[in-house]
Amino acid sequence: MIFKFFFIFFLIILVIKISESVDSTVNVHLIKSRTELAYSFKESLSFKTISFDDESNKIDYDEFLKFHNFLQNKFPIIHRVLKRTVINKYSLLFEWTGSDKTLKPLLLNSHYDVVPVTESEWTFNPWGEIRNDNIYGRGSIDNKVIVMATMESIEAILANNYTQPIRTIYLCFGHDEELGGLNGHRMIARHFRENLVRAEAIFDEGCPFLASNFVPGFHDIIAGVGVFEKGYLFYKLTSKVNSFTHSAIPPKESAIGILSKALAKIESNPFAPIENIEKKNQLLQLFNGETIKSNPFLDAMTKTTTALSMIHAGTKPNIIPTTASAWVSHRIINGNSIEYVKSRILDLINDTRITMEIEGFLEPSPISSPFTTAYQILKQTIYQQFGGYNVKVVPTQLMANTDTRHYWDITDNIYRFMPIVGNFMDFVSIHGSNEKISIDDYIKTIHFYKKLILNFQPFSNSSNSNYINKNLKINDYCPNSIYSK
């Protein structure tokens, strides 16, 4: 009890210090009109910076270089003041050098490559169209919105004569996140290691904030900040038989039948929920057990998931194939491991006629603390931006994967978020059709990053140090958390 009392006291002091750490007199105005900002963002979507993951489609890197030139033309002050480094031909690193070299830098990470589109499935131009106060286009949420919002916010800060931060800030824009970031953010992270850079914190993409009634009956906005990610395991299962292949004389057991039985075992035996997972993922503390079980989004947060994603066998109706293959995908929760998942699946199948070939894997990420200064500043900024609504800011788990996997040794403090309130259809559109953001939400995203940057530190030509409103409400300390132990 005494330890818990002092821990809570420490958090109160931390919040007070944060509230007094940045400049309340700073009033940075955007230098472009609402229309200019919207059309500039629409133009950014016109560059087909597509990451193809199949060899039949060649990536058009000219589009990536055109996007570089677009940024140079749209953000002249940034390119004059910040140091730009091109990493591995196509990724971009901007260094905004701070005046205090003893402070660890802040990294604002994102990516500008996008997934392919099936144009026939789009009602609007997938490469940028403004209609009904919405900006449509691939990348409008994932993830050019963050690239453009951070650039617009910093261009505005610089234009308002706040030219040098106390703490160095890096903008890190990868070019192949949709392929795993091996040539983009992995190389940027290597650049930091070679230059002995350790970061105070990294802010990267995450899940959009959940709109009111995203979970039926829950009326608050849920601002989930990803403090850890699931891992993954992708593999191919193959069954083989040595039998006559004419359909007129079928074998007792076919390759398809053997594989189908194995897949049925896998699908009908899901992984069990991790005990006390809500202590790591505090978003789950907002709901009771029945609500979690009945909601696919919440239920997936409690366990390692299984998805049967592809199957292949046979070439003609009257020929029985001697081999059949299927691909399976698991998203591995913190508390399970790759080896555990692999062993459990092989035990379930229990058939030597089936082989497993691993095609991709990643262990679950480390967990970042929500009680660091960086997290608390992010939390206060969310309250500033969405202060007119009922907002719950909670540390949570990201079920997808980001480029942060390449930075685990650069900092312990990695926070994933998307400062846009989304509904179910917004989630569906991210890698689907008619991906969009409203003009208002885009402008708000620019303001969010402007506030976050100003809140994170004073500037060397700023006289006061009180930017965050002291009256901002801070979420109550949550005792049911692993972080309080």
Curated annotation (Swiss-Prot):
GO molecular function, one term: metal ion binding
EC top class named in words: hydrolase
UniProt cofactor note: Binds 2 Zn(2+) ions per subunit.
Entry's EC annotation: 3.4.17.-
Domain of life assignment: Eukaryota
Cofactor: Zn(2+)
Listed CDD domains: M20_yscS (cd05674)
Pfam families xrefs: M20_dimer (PF07687), Peptidase_M20 (PF01546)
Keywords, sorted A to Z: Hydrolase, Metal-binding, Protease, Secreted, Signal, Zinc
Primary location: secreted
GO cellular component: extracellular region
Residues annotated as catalytic: D113, E177 (proton acceptor)
Residues engaged in binding Zn(2+) 1: D142, E178, H431
Binding site for Zn(2+) 2: H111, D142, D204
Family of this protein: Belongs to the peptidase M20A family.
Protein name: Probable carboxypeptidase S-like 1
Native source species: Dictyostelium discoideum (Social amoeba)
